[in-house]
Amino acid sequence: MNSFLLLDHVSDSQDSGSEWSNTHGSLISQRGNEYDGITPATKEKNQNKLEILNNETTIGSTKSSVSSLPELNRNVSFEKSDQNLAETKREEENKRTEVFKKDAEHEAVVVKRDFRPRRPEQTRPYTYDFLRHQIEFKRIGLVPITVPHGFSSDRSITSKSSHKPVNVIVRNRASSRKPPLTSTHRFRRYGAVISDSDDDESNTEQDHSKESNLNTADNDLALSSTIEGKKTSTSKEALESESLLSDSDQSMTNISSNSTVSDLNLKTLKKRLRGVLPPSFLTLQEKKKLENRGVKKKTSLHKSVIEGEKIKGVARRKLHPRSTAKLSSELGNEISDSDNSISTPTPTDDSRFDTSEFLDSISRDNGWLKEDVVDQLWLPKRSLSALKKSSSLTSENPFQLNVAANAVSTIPVYRTTKTKMKKNRFKYVEVEKLPDLILESYGKKAPKFLRVFARSSSHIPKMIRRKRQMDSKKYFSFDKESDRQVIDQVLSDWYSGKHELVQQSHSYKKPSDSKSVGGNIFSVNSKKHSVNINAKTAANNGLSHLQNFSEELLKKRKLFSSLFSNNVSYKKSKKLKRTHTVHDKCQKVAKLDHYIRDNIELNSKEREHDCYEGTLAVPQVNTEIRKSSRKQKAQRFIRDDFDTVFFQSSSNPNYFTDVNPFWNIGIWSTTFNVITFRPGLSLPNNSFIKTQGLNSILQLDIVTHPFKSVYAFSCLFNIQDDVFKTFEKLKDTFETVLENLPYFTNSETVDLYNLLSFCSAFILHSQVSMGLVNLASSFLETYALVNDRVSSISGLNRSQLVEKIAVLFQTFQVVFYCEFELGNQQNINKVSWLASDLISKLLSAGQSGLLECYRNLRIQASDTTVIDTLFLESWSILNHILFHVYKKKYALWEQVNSFFDLQKKELSILEMEKIWYVIMTLNPVFQIGLNGTTHSPGNNSFWPLIIRVSESAFKMHKDGHNVKVVERYLRTVFLRIHFLISEWRWEDVAQILFLIFDFFSHRKFNDLSSEISEDTPTDFPDFVKSLDRPPNLHVTALDTCFVIYLKVILISISRLRQVDENTNSIKRIVSRLQPLHSRQYTRESPFSIKDFMSLEHTHTLLICLYWAAPENCRPSLNRIRDIVIVDNSHLKARLISLKAWLHLMKYVIKEGTDYELAQGMEWFNSILKVTFDEYLALFSNGTSVGEMQLAEYSKHQLENALIVAFHSLQDLIPNSSVYISRINVLVTEQSCRRILKDSHFFPPRVTLECILFLKKFLQYQSNTEPPKVTVVGSTSHDSQDAYFDSDVLDDNTLILEQEKFERKYEVAQILRTFVSPFLYQTISYLVGNDEDKENYIRILLLPLMECMAICASFAVEAKINDWSYYIDFGSESWERIRNTPLKRSLSTTFYSFLISYNDSFIKKHEEKVLTVWFESLGALDEDHAAQFTILLLQKNLKNPILLNLPISVKIEEISINYFKSVHLNLLTAVFCNMAKLYADAKTNGFASSQYLQSLFIHYLSSLLSSMQHSYETNGHSSDTHSLFVINSQRVVGDILQYCSQFANDRNLPALRYFMDSTKFPQPPERLEYTALRLRSYARKTLTNSASQNALFSFLKANFDVALLEQKQTETSNLLRLAMGFHNQNSSSKWDVEISSLRKFCVKELLLSYLGEGSLAAMFYSLLLLEGLSRTYNSFRRIYLQPYIQQLLCEEISVFVADLEKYALLYENKRPLLSGRIYYLISSFVAISMTNKTSGLPSSLICNLQNFLARIARDFLLELCWNIEGSEFPPPYNTVDCRSKFVKTIQQHCSADWYDNVTNIVHKSRKKKLVLPSQVEQEEEYWSGLMEVTIQIWKHDKGFLEPELDRFLNVICSYAPDMSGLPTKIKCFLDKIGYSWMTEENDFDIVLF
């Protein structure tokens, strides 16, 4: 392959730093001895020879070979004394000076005839190395690396000065083998200190640009004069040399020779020295700082910072005049001025190195165009971020712009002083390890001079090296104290960052010479004809930018920060070497590259105002459009995350990024950041193509040529003028152009472009219009000579604009010869040769210029010129000319192909990348049309290059070279091919498809090894899984190479299908890409991951071909099916075949034919049948344990396969929005009937998947409707039906309904055959078989019942069956299933499915639905009732019992939790609606009320039966059970309250269960409901015997329950709730009915029980007395209004006397009964004596009070008689107060109880009730009497005054023996507050 730099990202050599190699440089022999410079005698001769050398130099020949520094003498005696060292040094210096002079004279007289003169870079390689370094640093705004000079004599001389002694440490110098310099040297002057600022990390990228060529003889002369160093210090040349050497004097080079500004310049230089800070001051300040702190910094090797030794700058120590004179005399030079003195360093010792000479050469050399990262290491305490921005000095001259002055470090030298050294407080760096550190950090070698020095210093003892980096202990003394103060102030300001910039002098004149491309070019005059080339003055448009830029940089500097402050030491970095990848290093280099390019571009505008005469010309910096930080970051992200950005340096076209590290880790760009143009972009309006100039040339039409008259170079050119004069004028203009070509600007280049365009019209006019073929031929010959000279000039001057001009000349040469040969109809070989040469030139120069043209074209800026798109236009011209000449659309590609050397068998990755880079970058060229406008990509394919590269890549992979990297590269190749076909629309893809197919076929269709993962299973690509819709063929990050290849196939065939003529091509491609063998994977053979992958990829390839190819070209389904032979095949192979069937059937069902659909279902049935047979065969095989385990494992695997099969069926069913009529084919015997019929053999998970498939299928059929198709009516106008407009609409409706009916009938028949009977069989088996597995079975039953409901709906709508067939007693009826708890719990679910899928069911069977609804409501704690209720409400059922339900939210917002909260309220509302409906029906007619009563009782029976079933089945200890009991009690209470009119315990047997306390717990609210019922009897007429008997029965029932269950308290509470005033406040009204009830209970019932006399009656009486006592006591807790008290007293007065009689009657016989009567009477006392002060009581109340007081007085008298021992009065013997209900009472008492002597026994329950003992009864009796007496005594003691006094007197009389008083008397005394009487006290003091 041609040895050229094709890619912008390919470097010439792998080395870096300052080592460059070139072709011609290697042929020149190196001289044995080196000369110090070129003498004036040989100057002119060297110049001429150098021109000859430059003419022979090809592109890139100026890369010099930089030699290393002279070796340091290793034989150093460190033990010499200072005196001996000084003497030896002087002797060696004298000897070296003599030898040097002799060699110089010999060089002047010797004439070299055999060899041409050595070039400067060959003569002085070190100087030239530093020259490049200095120029490059100045270009980017940095101070070059240098060391101070000026003290070349022995240090001991200064000791003789009259000044104060200065403590100077003698430094040993390494000697140089060269003789001393004879030329004069100027001192290196430092610029003022300026501000340093950190910048963003993203901008710290280094530019690795290469050196520039010596383009002109003047430049060579300037270099020679620079190296020679003339002695004329006051001459113009010396001043200019001074300007060149000093970085701050660049603006003084244009001073006129006639000017007398030499003295002014010298004064200016003197003034500038004031305030300059030498680096030695930094050392002093640092020392002072550490001493002030008093803290010793501990240095660490791992955290060392390169701390170069601080040396002095131009602010030197003041010397005595005698010392100065002696110094100058020893040096042999004249010292004319302290600033401009010329000194020649004299070496003192062979063992010392002359650092002054060596480092002084750095200040003069400014030709190094490469900034080396290593040089920055010499800057002490300077971080890399501080180098990002440069500042300028403040100057009154707006044109003055200075660069930053960096701190300087010296090269460490030996020190032999014997003084005691202080401990080094500074960080230490090992210089010998610096090159390795640079290599590790930046991936490039250090400069050779640093490597040589490191190698030499490695032999110096370590202690000496460390001492060299310590403080020099320099102390400076000054003649004046003011100087000391100034220096101290400068130090303080410098270190604190407050040091102001130095104002420089502006006594010189502004540059007046014109600015040119090189930056320092004077006006050029032609020799014959004066062609005015407009030279731009200094007042350029860039001036404003300079002023703004200088203002921005006038900032204060910041504190110094070390360059390695954020780095680690060499030792630590060596440890990190293993973790840092090459990619990380390349990223660092890339960042530095961006930084350097930005700085060079920024400073290039500054240097346009500097004019040099006789100096090196700085190469032209390309001014590109600055990208914003956002775009730079985006570009970096794309590079780091997706592609590698390959770019050419915008500042130097010779620079190429080295991407070998990227390739070593497998990173390549896919697109090279080249994308298609959008249509409509156009070249500049004045371009040759846009103006139809090229089109007129190709058509040989001079009339349409746009450049028949142009104005260029201040001359007018017109084809109407005399052609011969025009020809002479053109020749003169060309000559002028050649003379001034290096100094061209864009404007002159545009004039040249127009001139060459006119030349094309001139040739066409001369040849075609005038027939002057010889004249055209002569012009071509002249132009060829001009083109050759332009090529030579461009080889010397490597500026970008000159290269563009060279390309412009060569492009128009192709145009000229094309029109000449087309006009003469000659052979076109000359055009082909010229085009080939131009292509070679364009490709050899790199593609960065073309890419820049692409960017300019996309921007479409208004200021875009033809120069900005020149390379693109050149390529486009070549394309159109070659296409016109050869009539081939790929003619340009053939020329490019011939440029490559592709004859060898194998290509390296670098060579392949070169080809790819060219292909990608040339693709947009074909989008430019003859009109200069871009069009859509296409018609630019050329596959031979791609095939050659791909074959090499495949061969490399086959050979196994670096497999990982090669596989990554293969992926990049596939991505690029996909990109070419998809985006660039390359055609004729058959060959590349066949090549890739052969590659994968050889690999058995396996993925690459890097793409195979054992953890990640393979699967079909995503676009294959969705063939029913247009696939996404864009490449994703997860796509493998094979998937990318499949997408390429799909794109290619899809485009071929767009043209009908490509059918044969498609057939050929499809037949060629099909695998030619079937795969047999038996069950016995192992199945590896590669087999799985191979089989999957084979199916995928055939599926893609089937989908992409037309119907007559695609492979058949049987062909795809036969890839795997199903019988006896491996299960995994069947699974792959099944998945392939699934993905393929998605397309076949939608787009395939009926025959293909049948083939597909046959394929599926065969797989399913074999799997079923294998599964069922496992049940009968195997008897041993191992065989059984193997059978279980096989079953599990087969079950998984069946599940996958049914999943595949489910995936084939589309959404309901898509109507597909052929979906019915999925329901077959194998897919449904067989598994439902044998469901007991298969596990539930397999059966469930089958049911889910059926459910999805049935739901799709029920929810999908065929699309509406309007049928145009064919009714004739003569028919009478034509007058009706709705006939057509009716016909359409009928046709649509008929189509729906036919579709449903077809589905119903299929379901009837394969599904419905087997579904019912499975449901019946699961529901009625095993109730223990309810939860296990419910998972299957729910989808089964849903499918059954849908089947029933289809059968009813198809009129095959009626609803009764499924809900009554048909063969598939729900009622025929065994009535199990599981069935009852699922009834509502089944009916919910029926209602959901068919609205007609709820309309025809509303009563059945409501019955089921009440059953669901009975399960109060289950969720299905809520779902069923929500469903009924959603169906908007218009039943009156569902009106006004307590639901406060919308129906669609009802949730289960919300329904549970309103469940009971909803039942209450339903019961109210029933009561209202029944009441309305009863008023209307008896018949309707009877119907409603029977219907409502049926509903309530269903409700209560469900409640009873739930109560009996649930547990009796859980919280759920307790909640259910509470809810059930609430429901029963609501039924009793609201539905008592038509439902009771007689006609509603289920109600008895819940009212029986022995069977169901009664609620606490039962007393309230019972009290309400008791009150209801009061509302009735109690005079009626029926009502009275009902009341007797009700009370007796409650009394019996209380006696049997020991619930006497509940009965008392019942009576109190029914007849008391517990809820009545003071404003309550008198309830007459309740008062009558109380009277009836006391007078008729209680007195009857008391008069009956039996034991049973006595128990009833006790319960009734207790209840009545609580009832009347309840009146004591509220405030009674007077009239209510009056009425109560009237009520009591009726029966109080009778009660007293019975109390007296049973006083002896049954004292318990008497005591209870007295308790009742005590309650009367509280009522009668309350509120007596509110007014005068009535006579009734007074009588009542007196009657009650009499009872208490009698009791007191009885007590007195008891104490005195008197006899009691005779009691009442008989009481006759029986009522008319005595017989009824007797019957009630004897109905359930029979009496014994002391107890009673219940007849049925055998419950025995025993009376308390006699003593207890007596106590109860006395307690009752005492309660009556105490109540009266509390309310009014006046009623008991006489009797109470007597009683107390009797007690007092009984004082002698108080202990003998009865207990009841003591208790009474205690209650009335006289308990003290019974205590042992002195009764003499007691007064009554």
UniProtKB/Swiss-Prot annotation:
Gene Ontology terms, cellular component aspect?
Answer: Cul8-RING ubiquitin ligase complex; nucleus
Pfam families found in the cross-reference section: Mus7
Question: What domain of life is recorded for the organism?
Answer: Eukaryota
Q: Which keywords does this Swiss-Prot/TrEMBL entry list?
A: DNA damage, DNA repair, Nucleus
Q: Name one GO biological process term.
A: DNA damage response
Outline the segment boundaries, as ranges, of region: Disordered. 12-34, 151-258, 316-354
Q: Does the keyword Secreted apply?
A: no
Q: Where is the composition biased (Polar residues)?
A: 13-32, 212-227, 338-348
**Would you indicate the residue range of the signal peptide?**
none
Name where it's found.
Nucleus
The family assignment reads:
Belongs to the MMS22 family.
| Biological function | Involved in protection against replication-dependent DNA damage. May act by restoring active replication forks, repairing unusual DNA structures, and/or preventing aberrant DNA rearrangement at arrested replication forks.
Provide the protein name. Protein mms22
Please tell me the species this chain comes from. Answer: Schizosaccharomyces pombe (strain 972 / ATCC 24843) (Fission yeast)
